[in-house]
Amino acid sequence: RNEFMIKKITILQVLFFSMSALQAQDFPEAVTLEEAIEFGLENNRNIINATLEVQKAYKEKWSTIAIGLPQISASADYQNFIELPTSLIPAQFFGGNEGEFAEVQFGTPQTMTAGVTLNQLIFDGSYLIGLEATKVYLNISENVLEKTILEIRKSIINSYFSVLLVRANIGFLKKNRDNLNSNLTELIQLFENGFDEEESVEQFRLTLSSVETQLRYAQNMERITLDMLKLLLGFPTSSPLFLSDNLESLTTPELFQVTVEAPRTDNNIDVKIAENKLRSESLLYKYERSKGLPKLSAFLNGNYTGNSETFTFTEQNQKWFGASLFGVKLQVPIFSSFMRRANSQKAKISVKQAEASLEQVREQIFIEIQASSNEYSLAVENYFTAKENLALATRIKNKNQVKYFEGMVGSFEFRQAQLQLYNAQNNYIKAIQSVVQKKIGLETLLNSSKQ
C-alpha cells in the first residue's frame, strides 16, 4: 500500500511540473499581423529545422578545416605472453655441433608500450578545394533558410488575412440572415392578410436556408483557418489566439502600393540558390582535377616501452625505454586507367548544366516578376471596382426592398437584387484576398519585406 502511494505521489508530481512547464511558455493571447510574423519566424518548425541545418553546415566547415590542422593521438598497448615464442638458432653459435639448432626464447612475458603520435598535413589539393566547398555549402544552407523564411512569411500573411476575410464573410452572412428573417416575418404578415402570394414566402425561406447553410460552413472555416495560422506560428492549436488587426486597419494605402520600376533578379532567392549550385559544381570540377596532384604529410611519434616478468608497470622502479620517430610521406598519383580523366569530364559537364540552369532561372524569374507585377496591378483595380460594386449593390437592394413591400416591384426583381448583393459581397472578399496574395507573391519574388 505504501509503495502504491509513493508511485501515485510521484506521478502527480510529474504531472504538476509538466503542466507548470507548459504554463511557463510565453504564448501571446493576441497578435497583430506584424507580431504574428515575428512570432512565426521565431517558432515555426520548418524555420527552426532550417536554422539547425545552417548550424550543421557551420560545424561541417570547422570539421573540414580541422583536417589540415595538427592531429594528435595517444595510444597504450599491454601484452602478456602466456607462453613466450621459441626461436631456433644454429647451435654452433653456442659451441654446439654444426647443423644442429638451439631453442631460445627472447624478451619477457609482459610488455607495455605508451606513445603519442602527431600527424600534420602539409599539402593536399583536395583539402584546399574542400575549404572553399564548405563556404559554398554554408551559403546554400543559408539560402535554404532564407527561402524558408520568405515562404513562411508569405503563408502567415495569407493565413492571417484568410481568418479576417472569413470573419468578414460571416459578418455579411449574419447581416443577410437577420435581414431575411425580418423580411420573412413582414412577408408572412402580408401573406396572411392576403397581400402577397405563398410562393414569395417559400422563396424567402429557401434563400434564408441557403444563407444559414453558408453561415455554418463559414463558421467552421473560421476555426480551421485559425488553426492553420496557429500551426504556421508554432502556436498550440488548443490555446486561444485573438487577432488584434482587422480588415479596416490592414487595408491601408500601403497595401495597394508596390512599384517595380526595373525588374531585377539579383536578389531573388531562387537565383541565389542557382548561383551557389554553379559554384558547387565548379568546385567539384576543381576537386576532380586536384586528385592528380601529389599529397604530402609528416608525422612524429614518441613512445616508451616497459618489460617485466610480472605486472610491475605501476611501480616506481620499473624501467622504461624511449624511442622517437619522424617521417614524411609523399603520395604521387601516376596512372588511374583514365578514371580521373572521366570523372573530371563528367564534372565539367555538370558545370555546363549548372550554367544553363542559372540562365534559365534568371530569365524565368524576370518574366515571373513582370507577370506578378501585372497581376498585382489588376488585382488592385479589381478591388476598387468590387468595393464600388458592393456599395452600389447595397443601395440597389435597399431600394428594391422598399419598393417590394410598397408593391412597386415584384418578388423576382427583389430576388435578383438580393443575389446581386450576395455576389458583390463575395467578389469584395475575393478581391481583397487577391490583392494580398498578389502583393506578397511579388514581394517574395523581389525578396522584399516591405509591408
Indicate where each model-derived feature is located.
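Small/polar, glycine/serine/threonine/aspartate-rich low-complexity segments that form flexible
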Residues: Q25-P28, S75-V116, N246-E254, F299-V332
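Outer-membrane beta-barrel architecture
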Residues: W62, T117, L284-Y287, K329
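Periplasmic alpha-helical coiled-coil/stalk elements that build and connect Gram-negative outer-membrane
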Residues: K59, T148-T265, E375, A379, ...
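Sec/SRP-type N-terminal targeting helices
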Residues: I48-L52, I65, I122-I149, E199, ...
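Short segments within alpha-helical structural elements
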Residues: A66, T213-F235, E388-S448
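Bacterial Sec-pathway N-terminal export signals of envelope proteins
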Residues: A24-S73, D77, E83, T237, ...
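Terminal intrinsically disordered/low-complexity segments used for targeting and assembly
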Residues: R1-F39, L88-E98, Q219-V260, E443-Q451
